[in-house]
Curated annotation (Swiss-Prot):
The gene is hisI. Catalyzes the hydrolysis of the adenine ring of phosphoribosyl-AMP. It catalyses: 1-(5-phospho-beta-D-ribosyl)-5'-AMP + H2O = 1-(5-phospho-beta-D-ribosyl)-5-[(5-phospho-beta-D-ribosylamino)methylideneamino]imidazole-4-carboxamide. Homodimer. This is Phosphoribosyl-AMP cyclohydrolase. InterPro entries: PRA-CH, PRib_AMP_CycHydrolase_dom, PRib_AMP_CycHydrolase_sf. GO terms for cellular component: cytoplasm. NCBIfam families: PRK00051.1 (NF000768). It comes from Burkholderia ambifaria (strain MC40-6).
């Protein structure tokens, strides 16, 4: 299926898209269940993800499809796609190529952990940088 020339499939209508035609997406490492990242998809991105078995998101800032790893090489091979009980969040179970999902060079975008109390806490980076971002993006 080429989503650029054909009508999008009817199964996409089951997803509860927001007013902007987007749905939140969580990418999870299939082998470890680590939560890697959060992003958005539109209908075309979800259809392309199913078609190619590689994660394709929608970039709200660039207003275009974002093929994960198109610049960094850190693609996500999709093993499974799930829809939550309210049909308004998508979960991708992926294999993260190179182990780096975050643009900061870390395994996960969720590398900051809150430590402390409501009166005196802060966010602390608890996961290491695996590769300097300046060497990832050229």
């Amino acid at each position: 299926m080429n989503t650029e020339t054909k009508a999008l499939p009817a199964w996409l209508d089951k997803v509860r898209w927001d007013d902007n035609g987007l749905v939140p997406v969580i990418a999870q490492e299939a082998s470890t269940n680590d939560v890697l990242m959060f992003a958005w998809m539109n209908r075309e991105a979800l259809a392309k993800t199913i078609e190619t078995q590689r994660a394709v998101y929608y970039s709200r800032s660039r207003k275009r499809l974002w093929f994960k790893g198109e610049e960094s090489g850190h693609v996500q091979h999709v093993h499974e796609v799930r829809l939550d009980c309210d049909e308004d969040v998508v979960l991708l179970k992926v294999e993260q190529v190179s182990g780096i999902a975050c643009h900061t060079g870390r395994h996960s975008c969720f590398f900051q952990k809150f430590e402390g109390t409501v009166d005196g806490g802060d966010w602390v980076a608890v996961d290491p940088v695996l590769k300097d971002p300046e060497h990832i993006y050229k």
